[in-house]
Design a protein with these regions (language model features):
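Well-ordered alpha-helical segments within folded domains of soluble proteins
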Residues: 99-106, 150-157, 203-208, 267-271, ...
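General structural signal for alpha-helix termini and helix-helix connectors
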Residues: 13-17, 110, 136-139
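Glycine-rich, mobile lid/loop segments that gate access to catalytic sites or pores
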Residues: 113, 117-204, 208, 220-227
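Terminal-appendage/accessory-domain detector
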Residues: 1-94, 191-204, 211-430
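Residue-level detector of well-ordered alpha-helical segments, enriched
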Residues: 23, 27-31, 100, 118, ...
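Well-ordered alpha-helical scaffold segments within catalytic/enzyme domains
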Residues: 38-41, 105-112, 155-162, 209-213, ...
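A generic short alpha-helical patch detector that favors 3-5-residue windows
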Residues: 2-3, 96, 118, 146
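Hydrophobic alpha-helical hairpins/lids featuring a short glycine-rich hinge
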Residues: 81-133
């Protein structure tokens, strides 16, 4: 059976009654975390996003409370959520930030006047589809960006919210996939604002094509398995594990990860480890031993040793570790050190190595060892296998609320989301 049809069958068969309480709790945690990220981002992004509202009018309500067309509201919300690179993560053959899709789900829900239960159901559905595709195959190793899988997951979520039948859901998935194969260049070398915008566009596309499918527009019948479909063109007919789809059960959110620090997820454990080391003498060199994905994503070229933008810095393992070592802290103000002489000097002494044993431990563990060697040839090390926020060491609701408040989310919004299951005609505004 065509993969899109397998996904569509899961989407239409899955329902709210299949969601257990732990999954509901974690979905609420993800909504709080995502909306808090959006709140903090708004002050930086409003000058880019708000002027477009005049020409893209509609009845969907954005997280800022302004109205827009539902597709632009989806882009708007998702850009705000993704911009900080501080929302959740999933790590497998392909990484994903599944809560990116929450921006589109909330935008569509505001227009449809969906209930809180409808939203929880849609998020559980979208997460399951998106992360299952990440289990099936790696896009990044083939030069394609992970937002391709995000778009399929978001289309599944939008289809669920729109209550589409199996045939129309399959069309929405096809329309989300075939025209929207995004290049990994978004995340290569020196990074731009599109690091956040790529996810937002993918979610916008997903909501838009779900509406097209609802109206009866059809997509290619074999978007995954056709002669010119994803599996044959991108995966060369191999390297995509169809059996992953057999494991879909709606609990995938439990395997996603929340960030403690505002940096790319592969750096979370490294920052924690760096904070364990108190520099005492002149540093001769710093060695970071880690797994393949962390090295490939966070130390792939010279720009990561001398980042010029915030977008590159939060994907730079040498910079992130150096700042944490020198300041014994890591928060948004840490990015003010991009051009700091002491940080640049220490960064130049950093070496990043892939350790085969660590690569074999990934993705169930994210091992990193940092060793600081001093000029007198003494040294000290710190090791982490997983950071706080990993599903093996999860952040609880209280810790997530503390993070949300630090990002500027107030009690009114937090209380509203905490009680989302009982809401009718849901609208979330920060």
């Amino acid at each position: 059976m065509e993969t899109a049809k397998k996904i569509a069958k899961f989407v239409t068969d899955f329902s709210y009654k299949d969601i257990d309480e732990k999954v509901k709790d974690e979905i609420i945690n993800r909504i709080i975390d995502a909306v808090a990220n959006a709140k903090y981002s708004y002050k930086d992004l409003k000058i880019f996003l708000d002027p477009l509202l005049e020409n893209l009018k509609g009845n969907a309500i954005t997280l800022s409370g302004k109205k827009a067309s539902v597709d632009y509201a989806s882009f708007y919300n998702s850009f705000l959520i993704r911009y900080l690179d501080f929302n959740d993560t999933y790590l497998s053959k392909e990484p994903l930030h599944p809560s990116d899709m929450i921006g589109g789900i909330l935008a569509l829900a505001s227009e449809l006047k969906s209930s809180g239960k409808d939203v929880i159901e849609a998020i559980a559905t979208g997460y399951e589809v998106g992360i299952t595709l990440c289990d099936a195959g790696s896009l990044r190793k083939r030069g394609i960006d992970h937002v391709v899988f995000l778009g399929v997951g978001a289309a599944a979520a939008a289809s669920k919210l729109l209550k589409l039948n199996e045939e129309k859901t399959a069309n929405a998935i096809s329309l989300a996939l075939v025209p929207h194969i995004a290049l990994r260049e978004t995340r290569s070398g020196s990074l731009s604002m599109w690091k956040g915008g790529a996810a937002a566009e993918s979610v916008r596309n997903a909501v838009f094509v779900a509406l097209l499918a609802k109206s009866g527009i059809t997509g290619p019948e074999l978007p995954f398995t056709g002669k010119m479909g994803l599996i044959n063109v991108i995966f060369d007919g191999k390297g995509f594990d169809e059996t992953a789809l057999e494991r879909m059960n709606g609990s995938g959110v439990l395997r996603t990860l929340i960030k403690e620090f505002p940096a790319e997820y592969h750096a979370q454990a490294a920052i924690e480890a760096a904070l364990d080391i108190k520099l005492k003498k002149e540093v001769k060199n710093v060695t970071i031993d880690t797994y393949e994905a962390a090295k490939t994503i966070l130390a792939d070229d010279a720009s990561k040793w001398k980042p010029q933008t915030r977008e590159t810095a939060d994907h730079s393992l040498p910079f992130l570790v150096s700042v944490a070592l020198l300041t014994q802290n890591f928060w948004f103000e840490s990015y003010n050190f991009i051009h700091d002489k002491k940080v640049l000097e220490l960064t130049s002494k950093v070496e990043v190595n892939e350790v085969e044993e660590y690569t074999k431990m990934y993705p169930s563990s994210l091992p990193v060892k940092i060793t600081v060697k001093y000029s007198d040839n003494t040294q000290e090390s710190a090791y982490r296998e997983v950071p706080k926020g990993h599903y093996k060491k999860p952040m609880n609701r209280e810790e997530i609320i503390t993070k949300a408040k630090r990002l500027g989310l107030d009690d009114r919004v937090i209380d509203y989301i905490n009680n989302i299951e009982n809401k009718e005609a849901l609208t979330v505004v920060f």
